[in-house]
Amino acid sequence: MELKRLSISWQFLIVLVLILQSLSALDFDPYRVLGVSRTASQADIKKAYKKLAREWHPDKNKDPGAEDKFIQISKAYEILSNEEKRTNYDHYGDAGENQGYQQQREYRFRHFHENFYFDESFFHFPFNSERRDSIDEKYLLHFSHYVNEVVPDSFKKPYLIKITSDWCFSCIHIEPIWKEVVQELEGLGVGIGVVHAGYERRLAHHLGAHSTPSILGIINGKISFFHNAVVHENLRQFVESLLPGNLVEKVTNKNYVRFLSGWQQENKPHALLFGQTPAAPLLYKLTAFAYKDYVSFGYVYVGLRGVEEMTRQYNVNIYAPTMLIFKEHINKPADAIQARGLKKQVIEDFITQNKYLLASRLTSQKLFHELCPVKRSHRQRKYCVVLLTAEANKLSKPFDAFLSFALANTQDTVRFVHVYSSRQQEFASTLLPDIEAFQGKSGVSILERRNTAGRVVFKTLEDPWTGSESDKFVLLGYLDQLRKDPAFLSSEAVLPDLTDELAPVFLLRWLYSVSDYLSDFWESLLHSNWREMMPLLSLIFSALFILFGTVIVQAFSDSNEERESHPPDKEEVPEKAGKTEPSFTKESSSKIPKKGFVEVTELTDVTYTSNLVRLRPGHMNVVLILSNSTKTSLLQKFALEVYTFTGSSSLHFSFLTLDKHREWLEYLLEFAQDAAPIPNQYDKHFMERDYTGYVLALNGHKKYFCLFKPLKTVDEETVGSCDLDSSRGKPPCGLGPKPLKGKLSKLSLWMERLLEGSLQRFYIPSWPELD
């Protein structure tokens, strides 16, 4: 009886769970969210998703519920666009990312938990990101927001970004620490962001985050991952490590004069913070990064020996943080603040009010736009008093007088600037009426910009500026008239753009780029996972495989060439009846170069295709014509003549036996204009024509050849007459080695002309067969 009751109770519980599961499934229906039917095609689903995504995107729709609606739309499309997930949802009602029976049971239990316990905070497991009350929701990032706002803003302040997702126990574990760090760092000026990997997969993949939780920093558009334990101090040190190391200079009594005098070269005010800690505070470093283009920052540790001289000179209270701003005068600060706890807003307001020198030098068009903005209305007029001076007069009396005048007449509507005439010649010549009258002297102009295209109205003092009291009186009178009548600026011109004087040269920019690339590579090599490193490793191993493969093939090729280069012990020399071949002495044989010096192959029907017909483009085969009787002597001379040209990999060397392939040679010579008198085949001396010593340079790809024809000597003509007598039955005359070697005496000069491309080329329609 008890077993029966227990069985009924279990059945009732299972039915109750299934009913609750069915009810919970109604909470989220991807078909209902996208407004499509269950039989909709992928094209219809995609079309509906694009329409709803454009309508409910948080960047375009300002409705308070737009973000939640957009998340539901993305989640619905993620399920229905994947056939496997769509089938799983249709069969089991699984609307999440988990698949399979085990995941399905977990999903059903989760929805049962959410419907049975109405307050999920009872168990303190905030798995559902749509319902949890977390600090992350305030900092959620979308891809467009990241690209259009976070990346450009990272050039002014670093960003700390966390990658999270649903069902992430580690994310829950680090949330208290994350909340504490965010509250501190955001107050110091660090940007905060959170990316939900489930809904912003594109952004998570773009950031290179393949696991959750992940924490990364972004500065100057560069991404750096956090790899230490998630504790407060480590995260603070990570943010500090993102900042460049040269933002704040350590200043002591030995180098403070040099530091403050840097305004002349850097064209910036210089800030000094006197603090009681050995290192500069993080707030000060973040401020230095935000205003690095406008102010140079230094830090003085008041506990260092010898600093008393500085604190006494500038009247600094060493028991409270003190910040001083120096401009053109290094003996007295232009402004100062002192407080027990310097806040971010106080420091930013202080720096903003002192971003520029009293009389800044116009070094770029960007600075010109900031100091002399375009007039927007009659109440927002901005005038610029420009001192056009030579660079050598920077510290002279006229410049000092201009500074003192600027200090005494500082107004919201008037800016004082100066320009080096030698560096901005076009700009100076436009404002000065008579450039020759102001040669080597200073001039002062008052101008007002009318538009961004460079149109200005101006008035230039007639006489050069010497800094005298009369000059100051005249300039003050001009400003008084301008205050009463804006039309006082009677001249009009279009100013050319200023040259950027402080821009780094190309070599420095290239070195900076290489340095950044190497640092990024080293960072990824140390900390990236295998998924990120696989393409790089594949490229490296492929390059190494090709390199070593080429070396091994070349080594085997060289060994084969050396093996084939050993000459045979004896050279077969055919003998003719009634003729005695000349014997080589040891002295003459020692002059024969080793076969390894010049590799000469015989051109036969076997090697004809590879050595000529299918020769690679740009390669040529230099062929020596010889007979069986002249083979040894001509090859010896040929090797000596072409030895200096064997360094070229595009030249190949061969020899052709005249006794075997006379017809092939006669066919080629027919295309050579006056290269040699071609005998008629009915001539009785047709087969007696001597072509030994001829050399042909054959270009197999372009189908042309160049011809070397040896010059006949007196000895050769005598030998020729002997050959005629031999044909009549008389004994032939002997042909010594000297006349044969003389045939190729001019070959080296011919080879030089061949490489120069100055030889005559004889083209043929196609290469004949070599029988």
Curated annotation (Swiss-Prot):
Annotated Gene Ontology cellular components are: endoplasmic reticulum membrane
Among Gene3D superfamilies, the record links this protein to: DnaJ domain, Glutaredoxin
Q: How does it sit in the membrane?
A: Single-pass type IV membrane protein
Q: Which cysteines are joined by disulfide bonds?
A: none
Localization, per the record, is: Endoplasmic reticulum membrane
Q: Which residues form the Thioredoxin domain?
A: 116-244
> Which N-terminal stretch is annotated as signal sequence?
1-25
Record field: transmembrane: 533-553
For this UniProt record, the keywords arranged alphabetically read as follows: Autophagy, Endoplasmic reticulum, Glycoprotein, Membrane, Signal, Transmembrane, Transmembrane helix
Q: Cytoplasmic side of the membrane: what ranges?
A: 26-532
Q: Name one GO biological process term.
A: regulation of autophagosome size
Q: Where is the J domain?
A: 29-93
Biased composition regions of type Basic and acidic residues, renumbered to the chain: 560-579
Membrane topology (Extracellular): 554-771
Q: Which residues are glycosylated?
A: 628
Q: Which InterPro entries match?
A: DnaJ_C16_autophagy_reg, DnaJ_domain, DnaJ_domain_CS, DNAJC16_TRX, J_dom_sf, Thioredoxin-like_sf, Thioredoxin_domain
- Region spans: Disordered: 559-590
Keyword Phosphoprotein, does the record have it?
no
Tell me where on the tree of life, at the top rank, the source sits: Eukaryota
What job does the chain carry out?
Plays an important role in regulating the size of autophagosomes during the formation process.
Q: Which PANTHER family match?
A: DNAJ HOMOLOG SUBFAMILY C MEMBER 16
Its name, as the record gives it, is DnaJ homolog subfamily C member 16
* Gene it is expressed from: Dnajc16
